[in-house]
Amino acid sequence: MAKLTVKDVELKGKKVLVRVDFNVPLKDGVITNDNRITAALPTIKYILEQGGRAILFSHLGRVKEEADKEGKSLAPVAADLAAKLGQDVAFIAGATRGAELEAAINALEDGQVLLVENTRFEDVDGKKESKNDEELGKYWASLGDGIFVNDAFGTAHRSHASNVGISANVEKAVAGFLLENEIAYIQEAVETPERPFVAILGGSKVSDKIGVIENLLEKADKVLIGGGMTYTFYKAQGIEIGNSLVEEDKLDVAKTLLEKANGKLILPVDSKEANAFAGYTEVRDTDGEAVSEGFLGLDIGPKSIAKFDEALTGAKTVVWNGPMGVFENPDFQAGTIGVMDAIVKQPGVKSIIGGGDSAAAAINLGRADKFSWISTGGGASMELLEGKVLPGLAALTEK
């Protein structure tokens, strides 16, 4: 990566601004999954060990109006982070700017840390954070000593005041360890993969993945398709899909992708079908591709699992984004489990999960530790897989 990283700058005695991704799920004020906080620890600890004073920025959820602030404070995150670091984390509830926040920042000593309140509280007044308000970016930049560390891969595809805005107003904007690793794993897998390179794409909508499929058809040796979008590809070929999910307005796109694919695009050959999405009374495997009338496909079937297993044999690089079925339901997990197991059993494979539902599936189904890398950013990893330039990354200082 030709951008400066946190190891390229002198941190001792400096107020270092850090964009992290602490957008964690909360239930009744309790964090239900702290992976994103854990993922940011190496960068935060490094800054503190080097004698820097870390000033952390993060968003949490969506905030459009005053009422949305309820339950969106980063206070529980500050407490969790303090426990993980084993030291106090300064935090002023509700403060994204102002004299009290500035005083707390100026009171920091080397090796101490402060968390600024949810950056999206600034969205209540004209979406200042989300629209990268120039004045806000300048103000936040003024709170530090000219160094900004972006370690929030999850928002790297956004142009916000807390990433791009601060970057534009500091002397050096650098990548943290998490951002550096994310880019290294995903970009290298797509741009300079060890071959054979197999991409696996699931999820429900073709519309979400058109750019990704197009880019990966050029880069990968094989592209396997599963999940709900299977049925749009089926219908585009005149295959009966029963009541399965379909994007009627994307049938032509699916047809074009199949024509362009030169045999690289591999579709399932059977499905697990049910007579309803919820409250079903019958679940069965289809004989072939066609889904029965009155039924809908909710997972890939056993023949497809075997076919995908065969397609993955000998793969050296695998990028997976999107589950094969409705994995949250035990009746429709087999496809996702089968594909995960087929990936991780390949000797010497570099296996990457592109965030979002696939990451949740690997974690919930106990396979997370078997993968080389699990991305922390769904949308950002999708855009990297699409070959797009991420604004948060582009804004960093060149080496």
From Swiss-Prot:
Matches recorded under Gene3D superfamilies: Phosphoglycerate kinase, N-terminal domain (3.40.50.1260)
The UniProt record lists the keyword Cell division: no
Subcellular location: Cytoplasm
Residues that hold ATP according to the record: 209, 297, 328, 355-358
Pathway: Carbohydrate degradation; glycolysis; pyruvate from D-glyceraldehyde 3-phosphate: step 2/5
Protein keywords: ATP-binding, Cytoplasm, Glycolysis, Kinase, Nucleotide-binding, Transferase
Recorded GO CC terms: cytosol
Pfam family name, one: PGK
Annotated catalysed reactions: (2R)-3-phosphoglycerate + ATP = (2R)-3-phospho-glyceroyl phosphate + ADP
GO biological process, one term: glycolytic process
HAMAP family tied to this protein: Phosphoglyc_kinase (MF_00145)
Name the record gives this protein: Phosphoglycerate kinase
Annotated gene: pgk
